[in-house]
Design a protein with these regions (language model features):
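Extended substrate-binding grooves/exosites of carbohydrate-active enzymes
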Residues: 1-217, 226-232, 237-245
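Flexible loop/turn segments at secondary-structure boundaries
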Residues: 7, 56-60, 86-89, 104-105, ...
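Short beta-strand elements of extracellular/lumenal beta-sandwich folds
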Residues: 217-226, 434-441
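Beta-strand-rich binding/interaction modules
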Residues: 219-252, 263-267, 274-285
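Short proline/glycine- and polar residue-rich coil/turn motifs
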Residues: 254-262, 585-588
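Beta-strand/loop-rich accessory regions of lumenal/periplasmic or secreted enzymes
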Residues: 269-275, 289, 303-602
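Polar, glycine-rich mid-to-C-terminal structural blocks
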Residues: 281-309
Length: 602
């Protein structure tokens, strides 16, 4: 039973012609549905709650349905969310249940003498690149009355539609000339319509695990949230990584009874290097089950003793040519051009191979997500798109010495007075390019989605490896389940095929990444002083944002790279107005510095 459209108009409750309400002519149909469901499911052990319906407001007819369930079965509770809108019928439900309630609102209920257990019958609208902030909900498990919720929903709903060339694409509302339409609004699954897995499952898998792991340098704390099972079916693997490379692994077996938590000492075997060190404990299955093979990883915990590169340019003689339009830096097997006219890096040749297709430009915005559009961010943050696309260089500062070349471009941003961004390129005798972009915060401006540089290299550079948080895309509010490590993938694979193309493929906390061709020619990007975020995709931000379907993204003649100081989270409380939580925003009032080094692989 659902009659949403009869009592809610444009998102507002207006029940003047609510159905079924307390109308006697609807009561037989309501009771018939209740009886049919009861007779069908009464002997299924997996059915533990009777629900009177979904989004149908409240009234005597639904109250009579609840009375019917209780009269025929006194062993199962009755659920109905609609009383949220109509509290005089609160007695219908045994469970406090709300649609898309914010974590703070749920916590307020749980901390104010709750009379009923709480379940979010729908929450975390995972439309497109979504699922950010899920941990804010699962953290509520500390309250005994909180019984979790149901992510909306499991799978994208889309239909294959033929194209004139004989291929097919996953279509959504409006693609069949249907009007009115909610367009891609049914693309809200944690599984794609073709039953392949979305990157959103990375976060869900980790946070929904009944085994929680916290690690430090000498111990592991394990919480067993299972109701009946101990941990005898699992092995725990204690590993140490140095700069992302595994140096040791040992096996442990821990006895933690259901519902209990315990801390155990762990002998992590470390190396002698002065590298960044990752202490990790992973929980894996001892034997195969019907749903997973032997050795399947359930969850893992990490502790990182952080150490980011502080590399600086090496002083040695350079061959520099300063012309009217370019500054050329030449050395053994490399030549680099910094342009006075284009106001950026325009050429980087190593071993005769040109890498730069389009030089770095300022970037403040992303290809907006479904949640971004629902929250009104494209309007709120539109000025930053203009600022990135049309910034003007008002000053070029050139420092040329025998052993050093440094060029700084000072950008003025249209629409934002007294806001400057400085981008500096420094080249050393090895041909390494040290890049720094500085934004000095200013109060009173709208926030921006991200800050960094976007540029293009040759399309042949498609092999991607990185040392950062993976294996799927990771964002500030989607870090649970993303583990720091070294990953091998490709430019094609790192882009997630959401129903409507949007921001995708970001990797948070990256220390370094390489992009190469099949002959091992390529570039390495290393974070300096602080980890960055990056993506390497087949299309630019603008191309992705302008496409409505995946097939509209034509094969690009370049590999597009973004290196970012910061990017805001993707949100997920809902897709029709909920903003990204404050702690996951990028504030324009704060200062940001992006610093990294570019060098050839060979």
């Amino acid at each position: 039973l659902e009659t949403h459209g009869t009592w809610q108009k444009l998102g507002l409750s207006e029940p003047s012609w609510n159905i079924p309400a307390s109308e006697p002519e609807w009561l037989p149909a309501c009771l018939d549905r209740a009886n049919n469901m009861f007779q069908r499911d009464k002997n299924h052990a997996s059915v533990i709650i009777w629900s009177c319906g979904n989004e149908s407001y409240a009234g005597k007819d639904i109250a009579d349905m609840a009375d019917y369930f209780r009269s025929v079965d006194n062993t199962r509770p009755v659920h109905y969310e609609g009383v949220t809108w109509c509290r005089e019928f609160d007695y219908i439900t045994d469970i406090e249940s709300r649609m898309y309630a914010k974590p703070a609102d749920i916590e307020e209920y749980l901390t104010n003498n709750p009379q009923k257990p709480y379940i979010s019958c729908e929450y975390m609208h995972t439309m497109g690149n979504s699922g950010g902030g899920l941990k804010l909900y699962t953290d509520l498990e500390k309250y005994p009355e909180y019984q979790g919720g149901f992510i909306w929903d499991f799978i994208d709903q889309a239909i294959y539609k033929p194209l004139p060339n004989g291929s097919e694409f996953l279509s959504y509302g409006g693609d069949w000339h249907d009007r009115p339409s909610d367009y891609e609004f049914c693309g809200n699954g944690i599984v794609f319509a073709d039953r392949t897995l979305t990157p959103k499952l990375q976060t869900v898998k980790h946070l929904y695990s009944n085994i929680k792991i916290a690690v430090d340098e000498k111990s592991v704390t394990i919480k067993n949230d299972n109701v009946f099972e101990d941990l005898s079916a699992y092995t725990f693997l204690a590993r140490v990584y140095e700069d992302g490379r595994k140096v040791s692994e040992s096996e442990y077996h821990f006895d933690v009874k259901p519902g209990e938590e315990a801390t155990f000492p762990v002998e992590f075997a470390v190396g002698a290097s002065n590298a960044e060190r990752i202490y990790e404990v992973a929980c894996v299955q001892n034997e195969a089950t019907e749903w997973a093979p032997k050795g399947h990883e359930i969850v893992r915990g990490q502790y990182v003793a952080e150490k980011i590169s502080t590399e600086t340019p090496v002083k040695a003689p350079l061959n520099v040519v300063e012309g009217d339009f370019n500054i050329g830096i030449h050395g053994q097997n490399f030549s680099i051009l910094l342009s006075r006219a284009q106001n950026t890096l325009v050429s980087a040749k190593y071993n005769g191979v040109e890498f730069i297709e389009k030089g770095p430009k300022l970037n403040f915005t992303r290809a907006y997500t479904d949640n971004d559009r629902g929250a009104g961010y494209p309007f709120e943050m539109a000025g930053w798109k203009v600022a990135g696309n049309y910034s003007k260089v008002t000053d070029t500062q050139i420092q040329i010495e025998d052993d050093s070349v440094k060029v700084t471009y000072v950008h003025e941003l249209p629409g934002f007075s007294d806001v400057e961004v400085k981008v500096t390129y420094q080249v050393d005798y090895k041909g390494r390019i040290f890049v720094t972009a500085n934004y000095d915060g200013k109060a009173g401006l709208p926030n921006f989605p991200e800050f960094g540089l976007e540029f293009a290299i040759g399309s042949q550079f498609t092999n991607l490896s990185y040392y950062g948080y993976g294996a799927e895309e990771s964002y500030l509010d989607k870090l649970p389940g993303a583990y720091l490590g070294r990953y091998e993938t490709s430019v094609e694979k790192t882009f997630a095929p959401y129903l409507m193309p949007q921001e995708s493929g970001n990797h948070y906390g990256t220390r370094e990444f390489t992009v190469s061709d099949d002959n091992h020619n390529g570039l390495k990007f290393t974070a300096l002083n602080k980890a960055f975020e990056f993506s390497a995709l087949r299309n630019s931000t603008e191309q992705i944002e302008n496409a409505r379907h995946q097939y509209e993204l034509q094969q690009s003649d370049a590999t597009w790279i973004k290196v970012l100081a910061a990017q805001m989270g993707v949100g997920g409380d809902d897709s029709w107005g909920a903003p990204v939580h404050d702690e996951f925003l990028v504030s324009s009032a704060d200062s940001y510095q992006l610093s990294f080094m570019i060098e050839p692989l060979n």
